[in-house]
């Protein structure tokens, strides 16, 4: 449990100093020049990027030859040959086919075509594309000194096109980008992406030892040679909820390994935060979360999507964070000398301390991405509307948005709020941009529900309402990282048996563990997160801490009430999953059956009036709830008591319940 004698004054000084020093760069709108000059001239201009000082100049074919002749790949080829009984030459040919399918073929003519086409598209779609120039300058310096790995957040298909467009604009080396095999199947477009720097990989490799060897050697060869910055999405896939996803470690392990083996002096990891004022795929994501199959990537689908060009998607902010030195991070954490005990070309499973280091690094990078996400007024408005599904008077929404703005800024949120603009104008402007999600009628603001074309069943009406709620939730989710820790403390205070700090901490710790699949909570940071939450709530006057108690102040009631409401959908979602597992789940339930079964169970509860939360229908929440239950230690029973605005649920979860899965 948390120390009863923790020096909170020291913590206040430490966190206060950190937040005071959180000075972020300013932005430049790169579309401003595009609106005032020739796009063709821009695309055909002299492009002479600064390169890594240790670069080994080579063309794509030379790069492939280096990979195919590498000692590590030959070792695996011989291993696979012995296991399969096939001749090494045949396995070598398989490796060559895999590499041919995978490798990029960067061509400047294709890059120039994209530069021209994207200029036209971006000027139509977006009001501004804002980039922090100081971040670009830091990146330019980093690229010259050491191999660079770009790690953008991933919320839209637009992300990797946007990244390459920005680097081309600033005359920086274009990255080679890890892309899913889905894109390769797009006629013409797949090859164009390949010729603009994309290399294609399978979504999963299974136990394919040869594929993994070709893939990892290809990436490491590009890194060692300084061929180009490497770009991939640490989250692995687009976040349909606009919350950060638990990082995937495979590619990160690969790009860090050359440093551990002494093949490069250092590797710079650059977190990039891409913030969309309005998400292109907002309704598509909501439907996917409700079980509608994801549309297959195709050229015809891309052409049909041209209708989005008639829409206004507001602004994009792209923030290039401080380059993170792997060498500095690893100092005192990983003993690199152990790597000298084995031949470098023999693939080995990462050591435990290395796995721990890579995992910790991945979480820290995603936290840096979150910290530099730019929040627009709409994310605050969406947070308020979701806690008032019956709607709010426009004047009340305006007043509460201003209040929430102050709270967010006091918690060091990176908020893009128009200078000197009246709050009423900011709110009306946001409502106009997001008119597909919210509308004003009779002076009252409420969520928009799609109009049915004909008679609908109660289930269909519920689905339409859920699409609206989940679309709105994707914006609310963008501010969760700012309020998460104080919100968990607010729920813990509401749930704890007493106001004693240790009691509250125990509830906080349980919530922290439960929600570790839904939010980015760095392993081992439970106490630190609790202490930060205490500091922030004390700072805003929401709680006071006499002796060993944590007590709400008179001023704290609206703050704690808002925070409880913020996590209410997640509490209710997990509660519904627990109810389903305890009351409904049958023997031998598979994961494939689990999602539709829980959704059907939740639909019945909503239609019967026993549940008011539409977010419990989200497959993302249902998967995360199950993952949390399976991850946690159920050697003894947990009594889950969830107090909420609507209900108190108590469920005994035991191994016997989970054994049904």
Predicted region positions:
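Membrane-interfacial terminal anchoring regions of lipid-handling membrane enzymes
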Residues: 1-661
């Amino acid at each position: 449990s948390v120390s009863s004698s923790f020096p909170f004054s020291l913590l206040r000084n430490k966190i206060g100093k950190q937040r005071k020093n959180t000075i972020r760069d300013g932005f430049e709108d790169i579309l401003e020049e595009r609106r005032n000059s020739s796009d063709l001239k821009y695309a055909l201009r002299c492009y002479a990027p600064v390169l890594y000082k240790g670069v080994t100049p080579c063309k794509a074919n030379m790069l492939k030859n280096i990979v195919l002749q590498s000692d590590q790949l030959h070792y695996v080829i011989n291993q696979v040959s012995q296991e399969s009984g096939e001749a090494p030459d045949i396995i070598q040919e398989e490796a060559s086919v895999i590499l041919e399918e995978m490798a990029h073929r960067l061509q400047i003519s294709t890059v120039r075509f994209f530069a021209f086409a994207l200029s036209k598209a971006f000027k139509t779609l977006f009001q501004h594309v804002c980039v922090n120039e100081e971040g670009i300058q830091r990146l330019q310096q980093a690229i010259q000194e050491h191999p660079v790995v770009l790690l953008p957040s991933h919320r839209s298909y637009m992300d990797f096109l946007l990244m390459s467009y920005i680097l081309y604009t600033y005359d920086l080396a274009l990255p080679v980008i890890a892309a899913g095999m889905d894109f390769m199947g797009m006629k013409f477009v797949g090859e164009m992406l390949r010729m603009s720097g994309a290399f294609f990989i399978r979504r999963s490799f299974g136990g394919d030892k040869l594929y993994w060897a070709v893939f990892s050697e290809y990436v490491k060869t590009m890194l060692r040679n300084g061929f180009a910055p490497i770009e991939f999405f640490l989250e692995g896939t687009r976040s349909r909820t606009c919350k950060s996803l638990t990082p995937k470690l495979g590619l990160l392990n690969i790009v860090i390994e050359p440093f551990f083996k002494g093949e490069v002096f250092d590797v710079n990891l650059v977190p990039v935060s891409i913030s969309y004022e309005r998400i292109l795929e907002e309704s598509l994501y909501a439907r996917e979360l409700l079980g509608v199959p994801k549309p297959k990537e195709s050229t015809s689908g891309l052409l049909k999507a041209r209708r989005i060009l008639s829409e206004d998607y507001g602004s994009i902010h792209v923030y290039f964070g401080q380059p993170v030195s792997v060498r500095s991070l690893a100092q005192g954490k990983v003993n690199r000398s152990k790597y000298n005990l084995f031949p470098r070309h023999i693939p080995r499973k990462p050591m435990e301390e290395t796995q721990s280091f890579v995992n910790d690094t991945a979480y820290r990078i995603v936290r840096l991405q979150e910290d530099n996400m730019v929040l627009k007024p709409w994310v605050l408005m969406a947070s308020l509307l979701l806690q008032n599904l019956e709607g709010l008077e426009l004047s009340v929404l305006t007043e509460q948005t201003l209040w929430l703005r102050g709270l967010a800024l006091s918690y060091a949120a990176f908020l893009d709020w128009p200078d000197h603009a009246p709050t009423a104008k900011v709110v009306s402007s946001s409502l106009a941009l997001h008119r597909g999600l919210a509308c004003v009628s009779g002076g009252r603001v409420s969520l928009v529900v799609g109009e049915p074309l004909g008679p609908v069943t109660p289930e269909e009406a519920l689905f339409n309402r859920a699409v609206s709620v989940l679309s709105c939730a994707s914006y609310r989710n963008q501010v969760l990282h700012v309020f998460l820790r104080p919100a968990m403390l607010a729920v813990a205070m509401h749930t704890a048996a007493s106001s004693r700090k240790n009691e509250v901490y125990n509830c906080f710790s349980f919530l922290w563990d439960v929600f570790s699949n839904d939010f980015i909570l760095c392993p081992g940071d439970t106490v630190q997160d609790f202490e930060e939450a205490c500091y922030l709530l004390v700072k805003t006057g929401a709680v006071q801490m006499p002796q060993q108690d944590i007590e709400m102040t008179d001023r704290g009631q609206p703050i704690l009430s808002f925070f409880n409401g913020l996590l209410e959908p997640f509490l209710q979602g997990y509660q519904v999953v627990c109810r389903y597992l305890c009351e409904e789940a049958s023997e031998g339930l598979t994961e494939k059956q689990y999602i539709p079964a829980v959704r059907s169970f939740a639909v019945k509860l909503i239609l019967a009036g026993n549940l008011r939360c539409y977010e419990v229908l989200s497959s993302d929440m249902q998967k995360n709830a199950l993952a949390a239950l399976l991850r946690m230690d159920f050697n003894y029973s947990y009594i889950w008591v969830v107090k909420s605005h609507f209900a108190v649920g108590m469920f005994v979860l035991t191994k016997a319940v989970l054994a049904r899965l």
